[in-house]
């Protein structure tokens, strides 16, 4: 994920350092792009998602092994006023997180090495409604900040699955709410607008579905489990 962040920073630096942006003879690409009431596009990106745990008892933390996931979706942009836009960005977000439990969670219980690990796969239909606050356009780029709320449906939640961790299945909730904040830069190229952005995403509601046994070593000590993560998206409009 560090390499992805460095790539994002390099793209921004390379574009803003381009002589065309600051030369006296400026060529303004897509001059009327921001005057459109409605505009459309799509995005591709990466995510790195974690869990934030709140525990009932003081035990060693559940470790989360994160992996780089994938984002893809569409964009609908409504111009509210000169520097404010309302954006709907429905898409698909896929990620996998592996949980590792300390042996102390299984005191007095027979267990195997596989019991100490659980895989949590998430496939979200992700629908954010965002407000974008832009600065004044400078030649062919325009920085902005963005924030809003999102609803998500986790197609891999297994919430209704009768099998729980006693059968090897870690269950999560299907319906989720998030808030997100971030920033990015619009680059006006010859034929389209290219926008790299980075965002922090934070779950509002608890995601864990408790096991049937209230004293389950996997969920009994979890008071809440909330997703948090970073999105890096590349947008084309």
Where are each of the predicted segments found?
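Bacterial Sec-dependent N-terminal signal peptides
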Residues: 1-25, 234-237
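Gram-negative (and chloroplast) outer-membrane scaffold detector with strong preference
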Residues: 25, 29, 34-38, 46-52, ...
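Extracellular loop and loop/strand-boundary signature of outer-membrane beta-barrel proteins
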Residues: 27-28, 58-63, 112-118, 165-171, ...
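Residues that define the transmembrane beta-barrel architecture of outer-membrane proteins
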Residues: 36-38, 66-70, 121-127, 141, ...
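Surface-exposed strand-loop-strand hairpins of Gram-negative outer-membrane beta-barrel proteins
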Residues: 47-71, 75, 174
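Outer-membrane beta-barrel translocator domains and adjoining extracellular loop/strand segments
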Residues: 52-59, 99-105, 156-164, 207-215
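Predominantly the C-terminal beta-signal and adjacent terminal strand-loop region
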Residues: 190-237
